[in-house]
Amino acid sequence: MAINFPEGTQDLPSKIVQVVQATYTGSSTHASSSFTDTGIQVSITPKSSSSKVLIMTSFLFGQTKSVNAVQDNMKYFTLFRGSTNIAPGNTRFFAHQNESGTSANFDEQTQVASITYLDSPATTSSTTYKLRCSSDNPSQVTISINRRGIADNTGSSTMIAMEVET
């Protein structure tokens, strides 16, 4: 879904040029120490190479843990523009770790998270933003998107790209 704003309809220092939203209703699982696509993504074609693109994503995730442990493994989430990690320092936007529990406890949990980032893609070509995830110990933890670790889909995730003319 895209919303376009005709020139001159806003009298602000910055103008919203267009808004694109994508909703991911499927589910996916990830067991990798490298960042892998979650299926949550949005594409936008900026009208000006000087525009900024505000990316907002809200997503659900769970996990399956293969062993009981006092402390959980780390799960990492970041945004990519094409093949480029756009997190500060090319690292990640956030890491998540539950404090304690059994593998059964971890399998039952669902978390909701969000990332918001103002990007400067400097292009007028179609640009795809993707949410990717990884973990510090993929042999012990599998990240699930839009579901608990042991259940079917429990919801949907969205990503919005908003072109802002500055």
Task: Write out the residue ranges for each language-model feature.
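Glycine-rich, low-complexity segments
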Residues: 1-27, 166
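Generic, ordered loop/turn and secondary-structure boundary motif
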Residues: 4-6, 36, 45
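Terminal beta-strand-rich extracellular "head" domains
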Residues: 23-24, 29-34, 46-126, 130-166
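Extended, low-complexity regulatory regions
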Residues: 40-42
